[in-house]
Amino acid sequence: MTGKEENKQQQHVNFPWKRLVAGAVAGTADVWACHPLDRIKTQLQNNPGKSIVGTFGDIVSKGKGFTGGVNALYEGILPMTAEAIFKVGIRYFAFSWFTEQYKTTVYKGETLNKKQQFGANLLGGAFAGTIESFVVVIPCELLKVRHMTQEHNKSFGTVFRDVLREEGFQGLYKGGSATLLRQITNHMIRFPTFYAISDYLKGGDHSVHLPVWQNLSAGAIAGTASTLFNNPLDTIKTRMQKQGQNQTTMQVVRGIYQETGVKGYWAGVIPRILRVAPGQAITWAVVELVMGILEPSSKKH
């Protein structure tokens, strides 16, 4: 096999530390671009009877001075940025590390065909979702939900101390089962979907770096697909993590159905898509952009 052919058949993921850096940069970009949509989505899931416009009005009318008005949409963005740096960095590192280990162990380092690569990406996504959930996502999601749905303007630090004082360390993992399942299904869908689209656009040549708009499009499609599939898990997770909700997962599931029927599981799905689709578009585009800088020898369309 010639050097050109070897380069063309190179697999998706190499150098996990580079993916760690790329993920951290991408996570920061995602939060700063999409945090307002996340606020609206979280409020809608806890108040399903509200409209998007009504929820927007409630948020911007909350608080005084710097925390009031449109600034309220960015409340809590600094701790969310810190979370994103670790979360997305760990996600891409875990995915890269697992898929490399999987290919080495199962396929002895041989080049994978499309079906084998899809399976590796599927399992890698599940592994990445599991690792990021336990290390970062579950406790940070709980603090985010408590902070966004509180009646008083407490800081993130105060909310964190309140949880530890009233519920102990285990309180940070309340609603963890729903969050874990959401993250696993998220990335079992996003990684294979993005790379399947990317492979098609690259014509099978993994040395090619796609233009930004194509990575944006592939990321948005991957994000939308995962959201449509697992929005019920996100709704259940948000309800369980809201302060004062001391219910099991099944109790929350039954409660949502009794209140609003099946449609209740899809509360906030539109703002969640409006949040996740651009967020994933930005994340994937930035990851690929940073990888293009870290691996400048690759070709471009």
UniProtKB/Swiss-Prot annotation:
It is found in: Mitochondrion inner membrane. One of its GO terms (cellular component) is mitochondrion. It is a multi-pass membrane protein. It comes from the Eukaryota. Keywords: Membrane, Mitochondrion, Mitochondrion inner membrane, Repeat, Transmembrane, Transmembrane helix, Transport. Residues 1-19, 87-117, 192-212, 297-301 are mitochondrial intermembrane. Pfam families: Mito_carr. The chain crosses the membrane at residues 20-37, 66-86, 118-138, 175-191, 213-229, 276-296. Mitochondrial solute carriers shuttle metabolites, nucleotides, and cofactors through the mitochondrial inner membrane. Residues 38-65, 139-174, 230-275 are mitochondrial matrix. GO terms for biological process: fumarate transport; succinate transport. The keyword tRNA processing does not apply. This is Mitochondrial substrate carrier family protein Z. Belongs to the mitochondrial carrier (TC 2.A.29) family. PANTHER family: SUCCINATE/FUMARATE MITOCHONDRIAL TRANSPORTER-RELATED (PTHR45788), SUCCINATE_FUMARATE MITOCHONDRIAL TRANSPORTER (PTHR45788:SF2). InterPro entries: Mitochondrial_sb/sol_carrier, Mt_carrier_dom_sf, TXTP-like. One of its GO terms (molecular function) is succinate:fumarate antiporter activity. It comes from Dictyostelium discoideum. Solcar repeats lie at residues 14-101, 116-200, 210-293.
